[in-house]
Amino acid sequence: MSSNKIVLTSSDDESFEVEEAVARKLKVIAHMIDDDCADKAIPLENVTGNILALVIEYCKKHVLDDVDDSDDSTEATSENVNEEAKNELRTWDAEFMKEFDMETVMKLILAVNYLNVQDLLGLTCQTVADHMKDMSPEEVRELFNIENDYTPEEEDAIRKENAWAFEDLK
């Protein structure tokens, strides 16, 4: 792992000093490092300190996992160890996401989309999808602050036309 340190500064002026390998998990930062634009603190105006801390925690865990995978010496044991490590990481990811309410998850989605952390973006989006899969349209509207612009008559017509989609909902 690289010993270079990169300083990331959140929108609320919180600074985080991280290993270059961790910072490279944020593809936006990786491009800045490659372009020699990371010699000073990198301001991240679209990410608050508490959300950036969560992104860094995730990236640290995944960098450690990448390093652990590359340390395997024999190919035969490497496959078993690698599969075990992937399962451990999936479990860690699931536990990591359980800690957050939907508001935090939505903030994470915005941050990791901006920072281009694809694995965490997929994980956060899947968390939202899992959360809303059994929700009624009204609950989804409430979750995303969507105004219902259908008249009651239009809504009834849509529900009748697509009754199959509403069978398993509350």
Swiss-Prot record:
Record has Nucleus as a keyword: yes
User: Which keywords appear in this protein's UniProt record, sorted alphabetically?
Assistant: Nucleus, Ubl conjugation pathway
Q: Which InterPro entries match?
A: SKP1, SKP1-like, SKP1-like_dim_sf, SKP1/BTB/POZ_sf, Skp1_comp_dimer, Skp1_comp_POZ
GO cellular component annotations of the record? nucleus; SCF ubiquitin ligase complex
Pathways involved: Protein modification; protein ubiquitination
Q: Does the keyword Nucleus apply?
A: yes
- S-S bonds: none
Q: Where is this chain's protein located in or outside the cell?
A: Nucleus
Where does the record place the region Interaction with the F-box domain of F-box proteins?
Answer: 109-167
Q: Enumerate the SMART domains for this protein.
A: Skp1 (SM00512)
Please name the GO terms of the biological process aspect recorded for this protein, alphabetically: auxin-activated signaling pathway; jasmonic acid mediated signaling pathway; protein ubiquitination; response to auxin; response to jasmonic acid; ubiquitin-dependent protein catabolic process
- Give expression by tissue: Mainly detected in the siliques.
Subunit info? Part of a SCF (SKP1-cullin-F-box) protein ligase complex. Interacts with CPR1/CPR30, At3g61590 and At4g11590.
Q: What does this protein do?
A: Involved in ubiquitination and subsequent proteasomal degradation of target proteins. Together with CUL1, RBX1 and a F-box protein, it forms a SCF E3 ubiquitin ligase complex. The functional specificity of this complex depends on the type of F-box protein. In the SCF complex, it serves as an adapter that links the F-box protein to CUL1.
Which family does the UniProt entry place this protein in?
Belongs to the SKP1 family.
PANTHER family xref list:
SKP1
Q: Which protein are we looking at? A: SKP1-like protein 16
Q: Which organism is it from?
A: Arabidopsis thaliana (Mouse-ear cress)
